Amino acid sequence: MRPFLLGMLALAGIGVVVGAQARDYQPTCRMCPGTFIGKAEMDAYLKRAMANDITDQQVRAVDIGKSHIGVGVVYREKQATPEAVAEHDLVSEVYHIMQGRATLTLGPDLVGKQRRPASQKTVRVQNGPGNGARSITNGLSYDLSPGDVVVIPAGTGHQFAKIDEDISYLMIRFDPDKIVPVKTEAESKADLLGSGVETPDEARAAGARYAHLGNEYAPSCQMCPGYYVPRSEIEAYTKRAIANQLIDQQVRAVNIGRMNVGVGLVHRGRLTAPEANVAEHDLVSEIYHVISGQATLNLGPDLVGKVRRPETMATVRLLNGPGNGATSIRNGVSYELNAGDVVTIPAGTGHQFTKIDDHITYLMVRVDPDKVLPLKSASDSAADLKTDGRASAGGGAGSRVP
């Protein structure tokens, strides 16, 4: 029986033992703030990429307790020939395609591996130690277009076989070994004052300081496949959310070695007064990438009037694990969200929508280092979409088992 179906049976009260949620957990990130990255900042990196022939840039990297999370933006120009294969030993990635079209090949069985030197900026500040390679044996190819999502576990090769139109995508990186440094908002602003390009002398000097990153590391996900979630599938969840008054739906949840990663779709309707409850998740961190709409989101770790969420809730069982509701956030910080903005919410950090102008829809990426939530495969998702979603969704008309 698949893990996702086990979770569904437990939710329905059938005799499945899922005792992990009943424990008293402490947040894995103690008193951590949330992080907001506006679309304007992302666009500034894209503009620099086009001007200075840069492919991959880290915009921010934050500590969420059991992992660092990187948020970057990637720009690749149209090309007819395959790029070299890339593989990262310790850092996993999620792509959310913003524009353009390309064919991406994924697979763990690499041919002609060659160690990436620490003099490469990507090794030092973006995706850590790894290899280049000539090709991927028995790789699977996917045609990417705007709205698609790709999950690439550490150790899995990835190669753009062709790029039909210039492609740009949001990059989310998972770094449980914390091998890549954090990058603050102030450091991002300082970075944008420069060209973003290292001279050969600068690269050699930095490579000498971080020579250990050129060493061999065992991939943290051994022979793991990549995962592709097409925009059409995500839009099917959006359509169902609107039709059935659902809020939070898990589209996929996969094992990437050191953690599980969930990809979800959240749609919230108009809100004229603050939500009644602040949400907080003890073990699962979240990243939002706003697809459409506008809203005001309040973030902060100091919660007032906490009440434990019961394990019977679909959100606890299937979406974001154990945690609390609360009446308010003491000294919270509010952000105005618009399409293209990114938010990171560490485990233990409260979050509350205080206003939604018409609606807000966002891609949800969940980071589950304790693997407390069930996996959800493509076939699980297809089966779920044949239902009305009320048994598996959180919030709205989703499951509220007493």
Language model region names:
Residues 7-16:
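Bacterial N-terminal signal peptides
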Residues 20-90, 182-280, 378-382, 389-391, ...:
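A short, N-terminal "cap"/entry segment at the start of jelly-roll beta-barrel domains
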Residues 62-64, 69-71, 104, 144, ...:
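Fold-core signature of tandem repeat domains
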Residues 65, 80-93, 106, 112-122, ...:
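A short beta-loop-beta micro-motif enriched in histidine and acidic residues
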Residues 142-163, 335-356:
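Conserved metal-binding segment of the jelly-roll/cupin
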Residues 165-181, 358-374:
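A short hydrophobic beta-strand segment most commonly corresponding to one strand
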